[in-house]
Amino acid sequence: MSQAGRDGGDSCYRLRCSLLGHELDVRGVARCPLWPGEGFVSVSRDRSSRLWVPDSPNRGFIELQRMSGHSNFVSCVCILPPSDLYPRGLIATGGNDQNICVFSLDSEKPLYTLKGHKNTVCSLSSGKFGTLLSGSWDTTGKVWLNDKCMMTLQGHTAAVWAVKILPEQGLMLTGSADKSIKLWKAGRCEMTFLGHEDCVRGLATINDTEFLSCSNDASVRRWLITGECLQIYYGHTNYIYSVCLFPNSQDFVTTSEDRSIRIWRKGECTQTIRLPAQSVWCCCVLDNGDIVVGASDGIIRVFTESPDRIASIEEIQAFENELSKATIDPKTGDLGDIKIDDLPGRDHLNEPGTRDGQTRLIKEDGKVEAYQWSTGEGRWMKIGDVVGSSGATQQTSGRVLFEGKEYDYVFTIDVNESGPSHKLPYNLTEDPWLVAYNFLQKNDLNPMFLDQVAKFIIDNTAGQTPSTNLGYTDPLTGGGRYIPGSSSTDNNGADPFTGGNRYVPGSSLQSDYSAAAADPFTGKNAYRSSTAPTPNAYFPKTKPVTFDQANPSQILGKLKELNESAPEERKLPEEDLMQLDKLLSVAVNPSGGTVTAQQLDTLWRVVNWPEDLIFPALDVLRISIKNPTVNEMFCNEKEGSQFSSYLLQLMSPSGKQANQLLALRTFCNSFFCDPGSCLLMVERDNVLSKVIELKTVNNKNIHIALATLMLNYAICLHKVSDIEGKAQCLSAISSVIEVVQDLEAIFRLLVALGTLISGDTNAMQLAKSLGVDSQIKKYMSVTEPAKVNECCRLLLNML
């Protein structure tokens, strides 16, 4: 085993113990703080999960609990911290059967199973209050609260291999096979991080503002949550599967397909530990700094810095013997091209290495042996026998990784004997001449070498056929390799609860609008509670809030004025204007008559005027939509979709603010009657997505209308058992409350929050996990209007 000391010291990691039990690959390990001492949980392709605890006073661990519940390979594991509902915490595992199983510490069978993903669940992360984030090959992330799915994160175009929750800020991270990382807040994608050149496989949070990612491109990147990549770490020579931080430190450990774990101190790889297994899938760090590693040979190995916990001499020797007998394919390591005749003999090992983990090849009895330098022990240690060679003698169907991409060959080209050598990657499907030309261009080499390089490629690949990997077996599933985006399941986004499409989180569209804050249509803005403030004065609110004030004569006068400017084919005759006058009269005074079909037909024609002329017509619609006949006409099952689409089009962030405002108020007033309420619940995804887009419009009246619309949604959702709908509305409220500043809008958002969570423990816990309490606390110091402070106090007491 290779060892290396930290900078300025002799400390290095050595084997503590090897744990046998799993029968196939160990795919995930997680520190288990639920158990006193240094316990951890492992999961495997053998379909089992196991809880391991220290075997005091020995150096090893014993298997305390074996858990089963998956019908296929188990891919990932995480620990849910203690909560009011489960004071001892829980263990969650994700599997190839598309399910998440949740266990207690003393249960062999799941307490409950989370269903909803449509492909392998490959990553899990826990947050506060029982929140769980999962990632899947179905390209989505899902947020769970106890046994319910609260929201689905859609936006990636390939498998979500890694997830992580930043609980203090209510943020979530997802890493994907589409090479991107996304930052989510309250169910919406706030930022996409680009830079990795291949699948993102692992994530680790450093603090509230920084995190690490690892990738199939053989690199680790350090990011700020604001988007900047601070540093890139290179050292591994193949896919990096996992990254894990040391306790209270920015140092970390990584595992890779190159058969190694690597320990990084102060940004440098200070120790490389080779394992006698091809794929080192996973790792976790215990509170005492010991490293737990799971690999493709089914063995869990624990490494320690502590002299008190190091394995016996016999155990270490057995480990090194096993390592020395391993066979190494040069295409999977950092061995370079091998020319057996040019290799030195054993005498070459008398020269010390220059860095920890340095690899040296020697020729011994006709075989090629690989040795690795251990700085900590000051010796070369055999890490295996090299089988085959890279370059012209490649005979296997394997692929070579170079700069994060796979190739059939990676040649070493010495164009000039006195100059440096260069790597030339090549796939058998490529044109040798084009590859040679690009190689010379990239390395700024003389074009006169074109024929020579192209001929070299042709000569050294003669008789070979393109690698199709038809025989490849995925080490996770046992089937063919997962190709990002090629899932065999249907990823059309069907909602697991409704059968309809999921809410797709939208990103904010930045716009800078300026508008007078005065409301030209309704006068005073403030919604006032019908009773004096008492502990129950504000929520749950049970009746929709509407915009009722109107001046029919002014509205009709403006209509007549704009009618003169309308295109000839759109102008209304005097008789039609009279119909609108009658409609307004009935809408304002329901006892004054009945609404006629002619009046409704005229209204629909006038609201289809050009957008710069329609705002008084929209005001007629806003007032009259509260009438049951008008509401039924526009919001019925047959016509409702067209009506909703029309208003949503007017709410475009690039549209006119008067139209945006009146469209929002029309939606608010539509809740007054059952047809409108039903329509808006059906159209909730589209409407709330548009609400989020409009939050940056700089107009307080629009913000008040947005808040009122969400309040009316909260009133509807309070009456039904729809946790996903409540999660969606909570997400929208959390997004809008970050932006708006008008205190009347804030008040209505607070009432909406209180209405949503009243009497619903799940909604209350979700609000906590989204960090809503910190948003509420910002307004506790408001003294006027007093209702804002009072709502904040009541909400915080509930949470």
UniProtKB/Swiss-Prot annotation:
Residues 537-798 form the PUL domain. The PUL domain is composed of 6 armadillo-like repeats and mediates the interaction with VCP C-terminus. The PFU domain mediates interaction with ubiquitin. InterPro entries: ARM-like (IPR011989), ARM-type_fold (IPR016024), PFU (IPR015155), PFU_sf (IPR038122), PUL_dom (IPR013535), WD40/YVTN_repeat-like_dom_sf (IPR015943), WD40_repeat_dom_sf (IPR036322), WD40_rpt (IPR001680). PROSITE patterns: PFU (PS51394), PUL (PS51396), WD_REPEATS_2 (PS50082), WD_REPEATS_REGION (PS50294). This is Phospholipase A-2-activating protein. Residues 372-471 form the PFU domain. It is found in: Nucleus; Cytoplasm; Synapse. GO terms for cellular component: cytoplasm; nucleus; synapse.
